[in-house]
Amino acid sequence: MMEILRGSPALSAFRINKLLARFQAARLPVHNIYAEYVHFADLNAPLNDDEHAQLERLLKYGPALASHAPQGKLLLVTPRPGTISPWSSKATDIAHNCGLQQVNRLERGVAYYIEAGTLTNEQWQQVTAELHDRMMETVFFALDDAEQLFAHHQPTPVTSVDLLGQGRQALIDANLRLGLALAEDEIDYLQDAFTKLGRNPNDIELYMFAQANSEHCRHKIFNADWIIDGEQQPKSLFKMIKNTFETTPDHVLSAYKDNAAVMEGSEVGRYFADHETGRYDFHQEPAHILMKVETHNHPTAISPWPGAATGSGGEIRDEGATGRGAKPKAGLVGFSVSNLRIPGFEQPWEEDFGKPERIVTALDIMTEGPLGGAAFNNEFGRPALNGYFRTYEEKVNSHNGEELRGYHKPIMLAGGIGNIRADHVQKGEINVGAKLVVLGGPAMNIGLGGGAASSMASGQSDADLDFASVQRDNPEMERRCQEVIDRCWQLGDANPILFIHDVGAGGLSNAMPELVSDGGRGGKFELRDILSDEPGMSPLEIWCNESQERYVLAVAADQLPLFDELCKRERAPYAVIGEATEELHLSLHDRHFDNQPIDLPLDVLLGKTPKMTRDVQTLKAKGDALVREGITIADAVKRVLHLPTVAEKTFLVTIGDRSVTGMVARDQMVGPWQVPVANCAVTTASLDSYYGEAMAIGERAPVALLDFAASARLAVGEALTNIAATQIGDIKRIKLSANWMAAAGHPGEDAGLYEAVKAVGEELCPALGLTIPVGKDSMSMKTRWQEGNEEREMTSPLSLVISAFARVEDVRHTITPQLSTEDNALLLIDLGKGNNALGATALAQVYRQLGDKPADVRDVAQLKGFYDAIQALVAQRKLLAYHDRSDGGLLVTLAEMAFAGHCGIDADIATLGDDRLAALFNEELGAVIQVRAADREAVESVLAQHGLADCVHYVGQAVSGDRFVITANGQTVFSESRTTLRVWWAETTWQMQRLRDNPECADQEHQAKSNDADPGLNVKLSFDINEDVAAPYIATGARPKVAVLREQGVNSHVEMAAAFHRAGFDAIDVHMSDLLAGRTGLEDFHALVACGGFSYGDVLGAGEGWAKSILFNDRVRDEFATFFHRPQTLALGVCNGCQMMSNLRELIPGSELWPRFVRNTSDRFEARFSLVEVTQSPSLLLQGMVGSQMPIAVSHGEGRVEVRDAAHLAALESKGLVALRYVDNFGKVTETYPANPNGSPNGITAVTTESGRVTIMMPHPERVFRTVSNSWHPENWGEDGPWMRIFRNARKQLG
């Protein structure tokens, strides 16, 4: 039976206005829209009155419910029938954890009520198209139609393909029908294999073969034999990449054989809880570094949010599934798309060439895709610290005549670093009889054929197959699985995981054969043991779907009880679906139909399938000299600063959590003005050391339109000039991931790919001492479509994205572009040696040109010398600022340094040649360094010792004030105010934020950037930062116990435990499942902290599901009430813990006036480094800190304080319960965005009880308790940041 329950309004006023504006622009007479959530409960038994009231209370969250009866035509948008939304999974979990076992499933839709004039059927279709994502949602016209969401279908049996009867044609037909993308020789191979087996193949076997042997999974082109211009080539592409490892194997622990590569890390104190006692402690051991970079291009073109989200999720799983289990740590993301053409902000170089119907626009991709990638990382609890963004779409001359080159098929890059124990780097042995396990969520009928689909050029496959190949994301589920993996690796030698892989392309049909084959075994499986929420799925759909957040593992049979215990505690679903066999054979039994859908020798599936040969011709690029007429430097500056590749990226940065883990030493945002210009990302290796890890990106894809090899060399060079900004030491410590994107088969591109791989793998990297132990290729970077009567193609440039990773010697010595105005000198190190090439530059692009000669690595020895020299200067502390030269050239390098330093520039480019345009806008490799004037001679001497004397040019100095002036020989070349440049540079991000977020907030932020008087972040402390008020109590040896409380989806508990640990507490890991099961109680604890994250993925309101699981369980409710009423206890709630505890007001004495925390005014997750003031309040944790103003990490989507009315707010204030407020950089309490990131009235962001024993706050003090983890800080701070005082106050209060 289904019950329908109304929910809160689903759209804010500005979202409704945006929708109405879109309808008006489409000339649709829609006058008014009201939207509210509707909940559907699928019940297995009726609810009594109390249970019904409980369900209603559970589903009451967010803004107040509307009291009026909605007017207008109903359009009900729900998840597609046959799928289960992540919302449903988590909401159902909450209902069950609150004791409502009669609820089979909860699902949610949005009821739109449309008031409109007379609309035709076609116009109504336009309206519905605006209101739902056809890839994930459907539209009903009555609430009762939602019954279809819970319809159960009968299982369907496997289908046989009549090869023996119909011969080869049966395989050809199946290939087309199922979208298998099989090549002719693969069809021959299968015909031969099944003829020898004497039986017909089943559809599931063909599908499994297609996925396992797709280009996406098998990398056939990189393993192919090559004939170029009639000449046999000696090596495959992959062998040339492997040559870098053969030449420089130093520091690499695992390459080419696992889900990620591993290199040596540092010996540090890894901090985690003991399995038996739950007590957190440091464990001195090597934290080796793993690295991986994936792409998820095809799904992102079809449906950007889930495409980018599952791209990030898949890469995170790759990291977690390395060795015998590892810990993902920090991420990077990148996008290459065609021109944005922002409505009302179209740029002169942006022409509309059309696109295929089934893919979305570049603007849609950059509106939704980054949000999807960020949301997954945020909810999983991984900071996203690095990235790139390129737009390119142009008609260019080539040997094929004029052709369209650009990124209609986008690049969506997802990568990152993690850590792994030394003993777990290599996978274990799979014993015969080992249990084969799927860890994670249920099988769903989604993501079918993603491996094969992504191996085709967009436009080749059927639209329904594109539709089927898009996946769905549930990061909170992946977090639960990762917690299980963490518990396993933390057991050391007792780790129950023998072997682990993630489930990606091809689903279990690829993952399970790979698992057993890599372990030297076969496998025997039972189809019906696979967790599935859709009983009507066919065997093919169950085995081959790409439902996300799943891992496959081999676990020794005797370790299964331990594994079961860990999964139950973390509430991570798992299923044992088979066992390993001695015979290298794959069999899949179907208990329902008592048949064998799969019965194959493994070598048929994974054996020597036909090897590809690429027989190709070289076509040299055809460039035209840059036409200069009409180009002025002033116009060029404005255009280049508007090019998205160059322009400010704030709209891509602040949506991503950059402080979670408490181990982020360098994020994108630099300095007191928080400008997104960092050279590289840096994390600390642990919570107790200054060793670390660095990541940087390099890519120069447009150059490939002129010179394939130069483009590849520049990508390596740029990654190197970016990562050089931190203290690494020997260049052999740097390891690279190479992600290759090409339109294989396009005339000239294959030979160009070979040329590029050879340039990097055989020549440049070996000469530099660099290794490429990991990478990925995507060989179908082309879209085809019909535009009117014309066939069109959009082909991406050959695109190599290099991600560089390294161990860092001391994270404190990371140099940023932030300029100082002390007596200084700016030096340009020009590795272009005066070539100043303008081909394929940002300058050329903004004038719709390509040019002829591009930049290149001019001298490999000098590039190596450059890296060594910068490392020497970093170690000697000689550099004040550093920024590499890249897109936009020297002009942009200097401008970004000035923005970060909020200062002027007095530059002289007389020594850079007579061509001023080329001097300012060439994109040859190099960097600008700032040194003290007194150090200039010594610095130039170091550079000369490294062979760079002829590359060094004095180009002026940073000065106080707002003028940005470039001269040559006494003549002004360019002069403008820095503020004006800053505003131009920011206009793209402003326009994107206006489109995507609350436009009022976007306007406020943009306006703030034009204020030259802004003093930036600053600190005013009312206490001695170096005083340890806890020291006398720690000296007694007594360590009070603090319960570090987490719920499923919480992700900030480890850094919270570490902060309390440092203050003299015994931090104990307590999961809500421990309390609900009675394994742990709160009676032994002196303090309790509820940690941040996304409990239940913020479903049913941020923190509200967590709170209700306490309130609706009598025993646990009593336990919390007793704790809060007990004198001599302290409690802290941070972020999600704050939201949760604000919903426990009925249990916490003195909290009656506490507010609720609701959606930010921006309607967006906000990750900021915000200034707050400690106000006079009873809070025991903030004693002695009143009046202090200091920055703190903020990361939340629902942090805005909501009070009932003005009287409620006045009472909260008059009682003195407000503990922290947001202030602007002038020290004034503020409601203005982004200084106040959530729009809370009077800047309120923390409150306390009348006794001061319980304090809740939205910002994250635990993430910045170490100075080194602050995005910016005064130079005189030591190891401890000022927020460490909160934790020491806690220890002091407990005596």
From Swiss-Prot:
One of its GO terms (molecular function) is ATP binding. Residues 1042-1295 form the Glutamine amidotransferase type-1 domain. Its EC number is 6.3.5.3. It comes from the Bacteria. Its main location: cytoplasm. Pathway: Purine metabolism; IMP biosynthesis via de novo pathway; 5-amino-1-(5-phospho-D-ribosyl)imidazole from N(2)-formyl-N(1)-(5-phospho-D-ribosyl)glycinamide: step 1/2. It catalyses: N(2)-formyl-N(1)-(5-phospho-beta-D-ribosyl)glycinamide + L-glutamine + ATP + H2O = 2-formamido-N(1)-(5-O-phospho-beta-D-ribosyl)acetamidine + L-glutamate + ADP + phosphate + H(+). GO terms for cellular component: cytoplasm. InterPro entries: Class_I_gatase-like, FGAR-AT_N, FGAR-AT_PurM_N-like, PurL_large, PurL_linker, PurM-like_C_dom, PurM-like_C_sf, PurM-like_N_sf. Keywords: ATP-binding, Cytoplasm, Glutamine amidotransferase, Ligase, Magnesium, Metal-binding, Nucleotide-binding, Purine biosynthesis. SMART domains: GATase_5 (SM01211). GO terms for biological process: 'de novo' IMP biosynthetic process. Residues 305-327 are annotated as: Disordered. It is found in: Cytoplasm. ATP binds at residues 307-318, 678, 886. Mg(2+) binds at residues 718, 722, 884. The active site is at residues 1135, 1260, 1262. Phosphoribosylformylglycinamidine synthase involved in the purines biosynthetic pathway. Catalyzes the ATP-dependent conversion of formylglycinamide ribonucleotide (FGAR) and glutamine to yield formylglycinamidine ribonucleotide (FGAM) and glutamate. Monomer. In the N-terminal section; belongs to the FGAMS family. This is Phosphoribosylformylglycinamidine synthase. It comes from Escherichia coli O157:H7. The gene is purL.
